[in-house]
Amino acid sequence: MSPAVEFAYLRPINYQRCQNFKLWSLVVSIEKRIIARELWLAAARPGDIVKPIWFLLLVISMVPLALTPDSELLAEIGSAMIWIATLLALLLNSEHFFQSDFSDGVLEQWLFFDRPLAWLVGLKLTAHWLLHVLPLILISPVIALTLSVPGDVSIALFITMLVATPALTCFSGLGAALTLGSSRSGILGVLVMMPLFVPVVVLASGVLIRAMDGSETLPLLALLGAFSVASAVLVPIAVSLAIRVNIGGSN
């Protein structure tokens, strides 16, 4: 990778102040620079992190008003409502998954790196999960307790979200990559992602139903984990192919 390409990639991260760029290029790996750029974008646009959290809280706060304040009913449907709200919150940010990288030309520069494009996409998906999805997972047990959801079901909810959301994040990235550069990327992305979301949601709801009944949840959790692992391995390859096609079509 030439110094010109490296400098062009670092410019959106605002590293021009680095006094010794050659030393920086030698010391800092490509992976660290990609993570640093994601952190910089998150700091520059904190609303992208806060917006899904506020959306989740808003939807959950409307449930007792729209249905009933009965604690027994809320305890039965609370975990399912949190899952639905989390799913909608993930869709909220999926439209802009690769948009800033595509507009800045960063995706084109990825093609010149001495790393597989699928590996770089995997780093991007991991950073997105840590910054945008993990906060939703961490607050989900607290929200479940406010809806009178039993403690064991709240724990099952937390585990299912922790295991299942990597697959949902991968599918969100795939939908965003397939519709990259489209004027109606939001609608098209949802149409692409929803069929992929269905198996994950079905397995997660099965875990929650078994948790409420006091049945064994480990087999479904193992299947859900295998689904996420397979998605983490295969989806970045599909996303990298979609990015190559979209970049080739835009030139």
Predicted regions and their residues:
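Junction motif at the cytosolic side of a transmembrane helix
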Residues: 232-251
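Aromatic- and glycine-rich beta-strand/loop motifs that create alpha-glucan
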Residues: 24-52
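Hydrophobic alpha-helical transmembrane segments that constitute the membrane-spanning cores
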Residues: 122-148, 167, 171, 204-205
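Transmembrane helix segments
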Residues: 65, 175-215, 219-223, 227-233
